Amino acid sequence: GGNRDYSSFVVSYLKEQGVEELAYVIASHYDADHLNGVVGALHAFSCGQVLAPDYVTDTRVYESFERVIKEQDIALAYPAVGDTYTLGDASFTVVCPEVYDPKEDNDNSVGIRLVYGNTSFLICGDAGKAEEQAMLDSGVTLDSDVYLASHHGSEGSSSEAFMRAVSPTAVVVSAGAGNSYGHPTRTVLNRVKACGAALYRTDLQGTITVTSDGTSLSWSVDATQDYRDGDEVAAGAADTTGTSGTAGAGVTDAAAGSTDTTGTSGTADTADSAAQASVAADTAGSAAQASGGETAA
């Protein structure tokens, strides 16, 4: 959930959605651009359980994460592949990592596949090719309607084989407008186009929300036809591929699980969509990604 400055943005966004308590908060991993908003959400809302990867790191934001969990006596779980959690009429299953490696960071990302009725969502944090291959080898179900592109559309994620297994109808890329990492990369954008999925980009379109009623999906914005990579967007290159979106702030690793009587809402990165649940999971997550504040590659 964004850099420190964006923690209040994540909290404000969730409050605007009517969130009062969180059944689950998922910290995909401990990079600052995924964890700061999580810490803010834990301070602001009552939380039933936190799901996080089983490793430690020597950073101030991780220390803050540990502190708020202890101070508020929040249940903390290190989920395993196959663990399933219920959210009203929806549920989500952990799809990665197969093994927690203390030497890894991005490939320790906790990934979930969320299902509500006939709709499904795949969110895997900053998982790279090694973790993607482990998912493919394990045989977990990956096929999903909506795929939140791992690692902000980095070339080291969303391999061709993985994209074939997911077979998404829509791909959301959460990346900061004008970020210095070139996210999303040309390679990943080409893979999205090749699989025929609709493309949504927070660097061009700001906050993106997808809502499921268990049968169909509703989007807050139209899909973009702009396939410029992150470097081209940062350089101000003209869009020759289609229609550009509108740059703005977005919310994308923080929280899952407040009452939503209208259906399932999902916000691209947190974070992190569920029946009777508002999901901000790596989907309330990185406000920094969506407003040009990426700090981790």
Feature annotation, model-predicted:
Residues 1-297:
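Non-globular, low-confidence helical/coil segments that flank catalytic cores
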